Amino acid sequence: MLQHVGIELQAADVDRAVEFFTLLGFTRVEPPPALVDGFTWLERDGTQVHLMHDERPTVPPRAHLAVVTADLEATLSRLHEHGFEARPGREHWGAPRAHAIAPGGHRVELMAKPPPASA
């Protein structure tokens, strides 16, 4: 099980990133006291996204997070309503996919269901 992933972004993008991940079902949680400065944590179903505040963040051009969403069309609508870039993608393993850009430029794949374990 993946416990967390960390992504770098400028401090100015943190509030919008929290809004973005909240629309994907994450909630903000408090990091340990030693990590309060410079980090913002979000969690959904035991998996965390750690937003690491950085003056010069690194955004890998092809790397991405993949998030399963119960209602892909509703998720895309919510993202658009809040001004986030998101577009439908190709179907894989019998389920639709979409792609969004999180604040800070990180790519996020949205999946209607995960691929089978053997994929």
Region annotations inferred by a language model:
Residues 39, 48, 66, 97-99:
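Short hydrophobic/aromatic beta-strand element in the GNAT-like acyltransferase core
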